[in-house]
Amino acid sequence: MRELLEKIAAEGEVVADGVLKVDRFLNHQVDPHLMKRIGEEFAAQFHRERPTKVLTLESSGISPALMAAYELGVPLVVARKRRPLTMTSEVYCAEVYSFTKKETNEIIVSRPLLDSSDRVLIIDDFLANGQAALGMVEVVRQAGADVVGIGIVIEKAFQDGGRLLRSQGFRVVSLARIASLSDGVIRFHEEVMS
């Protein structure tokens, strides 16, 4: 997605080898026009799979996932990292390791929000080692539902997550693929989605 690539090139910042800071438009301050375009692109890519729900992990995946759900006309389910007092029902849960925070979290989804009839599209802001996506896949499987695709805003193609998910048969659509983040330079993968 050319608009996203241009935004990353202009406003993204390499803060360490393998770490890309995009807090000016994606995960701290959010560019609503860009999120709308991202939602439209994910909807265009996945509408044939007829998802009934979009699933993301709090908190940085919420903006692009909400716009995708809006464009698809389906509910958004947000997997939580902590169980709030208001979550009184039984839950689906899985452990997820965060590459950025270097910690393991348990993610949870209230059971009434997913069931075996659901066709779930997973959306997330980043794909690095694939652990967040695999945790969400596990939650969907616990519900007996189907994962119909995985949409990623920014994939770190130099890490194993994309290969891991694709090797398991998942259709993964990444709107921007980063080839490397070394020496303070953002290098994009040659494949560019319009």
Swiss-Prot record:
* CDD domains in the cross-refs: PRTases_typeI (cd06223)
Cited InterPro entries: PRibTrfase_dom (IPR000836), PRTase-like (IPR029057), Pur/Pyrimidine_PRTase (IPR050118), Xanthine_PRibTrfase (IPR010079)
Any single Gene Ontology cellular-component annotation: cytoplasm
Q: Where does 5-phospho-alpha-D-ribose 1-diphosphate bind?
A: A128, N129, G130, Q131, A132
NCBIfam families for this protein? PRK09219.1, XPRTase
Similarity comment text for this entry = Belongs to the purine/pyrimidine phosphoribosyltransferase family. Xpt subfamily.
Q: How does it assemble?
A: Homodimer.
Give the protein's recorded name. Xanthine phosphoribosyltransferase
